[in-house]
Amino acid sequence: MAKLIRRGFISLILVVIMCTSLFVGCGSKYEFNHDYLFGLCDPSGSLGGGVDKAITNEWLGDVADVLGVKSFRLWVNIDSSTGNGMFFVDSDNNLSFNKGYLAKVHDYVDNLKRGGVENFLFLNTTYLSPYESSMTGFDVPDVNENPDEYLEFIKLNAKAYGMLAEEFPEIKNWETGNEPDLGGAGMHKHGYVYGANSAINKPFIFSDREIAEIICDLSWYIRKELKAVNEENRVSLPGLSLYYDVDHSFFESIYEVIESKTAPFGQEFSDTDPDNYFDIIDYHPYMNADKFSPPYYLKFPEEMWDEWTNTQLEIHEIASDHGDKDKPAYFSEFGYTDVGERFNGNLQNNIADNYVIAFDIIKEKMPWVEVVFCFRATTLVYQKASDNKTEENYGIFYNQDDPDHGGKAKPAAKKLAEYFGTYDANKFAAFENKYKKK
């Protein structure tokens, strides 16, 4: 029986294990695939759960078609404890699909496939918790307080991914969470309160080391389940923010956990090969514009582009130092907000130009980046965010229910389509006519 200890007592680095059907690696050089570089991401309002209702499955499929994107990051809630998610957990911790929600997700995927998407990245927006647990959302058991519940939590979520892989064979890339490193918002102990001040939430926030350990445990167990379904399935790191990780210490801590011979938790061995935890490096390289005052995003100075480029090169260097030079990277969120300046033509054009500059740099200096998922498809009308001027005004299209620009493409949408050779003026005109505000 596996011992519930963090430190494994057998250091399992045997090649015979690494090369089984459940694990890959063995030092072969990875061939980067850039066919799917242009990606998009947005949750669907058709799934419910507080997402803007104007962002429908049909609309997202039409957006994919008019843009010509081949990659899409799916946002799915796997926890049905509130009635709106993928799985139910029974008293024996067995899982069953919520058939109504499952049908909506199939429609989400099918509409995107209709729009030409071939490369999917699956993101779960919540975690599953054991039946008798009081946890919800992004709550994670504290392994130091309740190791049994922690291990059950890890295995339950891994099992869910295996069931999803069987249900959605067209999805080959699987993300294990979103921004767990962002101050507790994406991963925390039970008792964390969204919107509360830091003094109240401090006892419920994991340390960076603890977050890295949870990431490694989830990734290892999930990868094992996914590979058992299809060897082509790949696990990505959860979409790391890294926005405040200026010295890259958090990113490096993931490798430190793997190399410390303390992971995965609950096994009678340690596994020190990063390939057995994740196949894709995944983070959100938003540009740090905090130092610039309004008007935002005019023309970024050259030194800002240099700083941004060097940051990505430094992150890749850390991965290379730990044996992951040839591991692909996904930028699972990247984009610009107009902070509500919707009528500022210069601003909109400069945002469009900034996308092109970023893609030029990526193509020239970052061959390991396989997909950039532009965040997001549309501005928000019905879904309100706490920092609404910023969060609600990402999007390369105007929301179809925008009172002034309903259904129109922003300059960035057309510029990106032109850049990737998918622009069709007739398609854009037909799209805008279909969704214009009546």
Language-model-detected regions and their locations in the chain:
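Noncatalytic carbohydrate-binding groove/subsite architecture in carbohydrate-active enzymes
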Residues: I154, I205-Q348
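Sec-dependent N-terminal signal peptides of Gram-positive bacterial secreted proteins and lipoproteins
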Residues: R7-C26
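Short, acidic/polar
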Residues: G48-A64, I154-L164, S249-S270, A352-I361
